Amino acid sequence: MRPKRHPGLGCAVASALALIGVAPAFAQDTRSGAPVTCANLKSVRVPKTVVAVAESVPAGQFRPAAAPAFGPPIDYSQLPAFCRVVGTILATAESDIRFELWLPEEWNGKFMQTGNGGAAGAIVQASLVDPLMRGYAVTNTDTGHQGAGGDFGWASQPERLVDYQYRAVHELTVVGKALTAFHYGREADRSYWLGCSTGGRQGLKEAQRYPEDYDGIVAGAPASNWSALMALSITIQRNLGEGGLGVDKLGVLKEAAIAACDADDGVADRVITNFATCGFDPTSLQCPAGPTAQCLSPTEVAAAQRIYAGVVDGRGQTVIPGTGFGSEPLWAAYASPQFAIGTNYFRNVVAKDPNWNPAAFDVDRDLARAEAVDNGAAKAMDPDLSEFVKRGGKLITYHGTTDGLIPYGNSVSYHEAVVEELGERRARDSVKLYLVPGMDHCSGGEGAFAVDWLTPLENWIENGEEPAALAAAHPPATPGPPGAPPAPASPPFTRPVCPYPQVPTYDGSGDVADAASFECVEPGGERPARRVLQIGR
């Protein structure tokens, strides 16, 4: 069933454009249904917006500004013909919100914005590729500054910080929809958000603060509990290296956790599926005599326990949980000078002191300061999605259980708070959480991490098909970014990804590489008879 066209479409478009102050001549063009050519989009007057580039790109001819900083290389050679718009939104006198909007010749009638990672600071062209291939008018922003993913040196300008926290995404939603309507002569039938990490946080913030912006939101591994997450970054950083846990021991911890809990689901596949009941204890690795490469000193055991515990305040209350068993190698990112995001955030935003030392971090004092400074601007933990749900909005959140940067337990806590706020029936009809066993941060990992999140969301909104178990695959080794060593070979397999709180459970006899041999079962529910099988790697 195709999405219904809006009644009185011309008037609706004209009204929407008038709200953002579009010049009457162009509003008249849109009312008449006359599309604006790609080149002429440079002349469309949208207040506070400057379009610097509006160019037609023939099929297969786009060349990106730079290779992606992480992830596999992107193949741009198969891109269809599209109109590429590059512009800037001057939301305030300090603002410099840069964006790209890609408008395909063969449009599917829908609009999408994609999210960012870390501290943003760049337009993520790679995130536009798949939506464009699907026919979306799709856009992305640098959120108002240029910089690396863990850098907050730009945040001394208060309005640019607000742009990053939430404003840039909303401003681009309005401007992107308007430019899309001009180009095609009508507004989009549906609007979608797709993002992970900071992009997941941005998606939740849209649902909470601007519930009318998007019909459907995919929020992966959301960095939603913002100040607490920055504190977790510092906690991990402080407990790694000299005087703590050696980075060279992170793989030892991961292997021990897998050995302790992998077979609990009946399949020894290096994926901990019963993650909630895994009872791995790092004291089992404590060296019985002198230190070796395969055991931990008492100091290292204590450091690992502190990281697993997450951020705990002076009353013994968990502020944000630690990351899951099997996620340990990813902790090293927070100890890297290139991604000491928590330290950079506290130095530039909270303490406003370039010499602030994370060794002096005090949970009770400094987290309270951070929450006061943020004042809910970046934080996206408000469980009241009633306005978003009331207008038919749908939300899919996903999170890998071996995400070592953002704990999946935070997504569980938020989802449960939303269910309590909305009530089980309304929540079931509008929000879904999927925990992906063995998936790292947003993608990758030992598990079946390749999932099409967008199609189930489209079917839910456009066809009324409520998503249940989704198909997930662990593909053969994929190439890393340019210059990276080749990924180790691993056999492909498939699994179902289950709506929380269900978990995938082996049927006891089928092919362990086939998702059909697994079913989604409520924790504590009746499970099929199981036997442990090995999957080689």
Which residue stretches match the model-derived regions?
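Bacterial N-terminal signal peptides
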Residues: 11-22
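Bacterial N-terminal signal peptides that target proteins for export
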Residues: 2-13
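Glycine-rich nucleophile elbow surrounding the catalytic serine of serine-hydrolase chemistry
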Residues: 196-205
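A catalytic-pocket lid/entrance helix-loop region that shapes and gates access to the active site
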Residues: 161, 205-207, 212-312, 435
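Short beta-strand/loop motif that positions the catalytic acidic residue
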Residues: 397-399
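Cap/lid segment of the alpha/beta-hydrolase catalytic domain
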Residues: 108, 117-188, 231-232, 239, ...
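Alpha/beta-hydrolase fold nucleophile elbow
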Residues: 186-197
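Catalytic-loop region of hydrolases
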Residues: 27-110, 124-126, 268, 272, ...
